Amino acid sequence: MTKKITPLIKEFSFKDIKRNIPKRKNSAHKGDHGKLLVIAGDEGFGGAGIMSAESGLKAGAGLVRLLTRKLHISASLARNPEIMVSGADNAQDLEENLSWPNAIVAGPGMFENFWSEQILFKLLVKITEKKIPVLLDAGALRLLTYKAFSKMKLHDQMVLTPHPGEAADMLKVSTQEIQKNRIESAKKLQKKYNCIIVLKGQGTIICNKKEIYLCASGGPELAVAGTGDIL
């Protein structure tokens, strides 16, 4: 059971998460369990998109589509033929896919370059109109610190999932400053971006406008490349 540490901070474990996963009806079909769009995988980092899309499927999404660089399509289909894959050369290719999902993940394997920047900019412009759940991770978080994104208004159904280094960039402080007071850092990020914050690391912190949750699980087993792309 979720344990209160203070009136505003609650501790949770994997058991708490498991209890809140809805049970599926025997008559359920793929259309009952959501359509997830994963926007990920710039040149040379197709694996990040492939792993993110695969983890979405394993987490229970009924349908998953990966939007990535065209050169990664064949690798994705070879590994996960059940995941739909679309190639994107520019922001127009993204717009054609935005009417389909009811949840979006963007950022794994994206970088500070023109392709990633135009894709993320178009996404943020369009989803503020739709207000569907969007999770931003990795390269998307770095891009949020760019001047071009400084006046973007993010809605409160968005989730930002920085590790300490990304959080430091977002708050313009050192990583040591983030780690010194992780709860306060998460609160500052929430206030700055008006989103749900998941500050990753030992004792992952989830922070929204009203409450803070502290994860009691986790360890050094996750300290390998790729785990961030599936979290």
Where are the predicted features?
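Small-residue (G/A/S/T)-rich helix-start motifs and N-terminal tracts that mark the onset
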Residues: 1-133, 142-159, 164-231
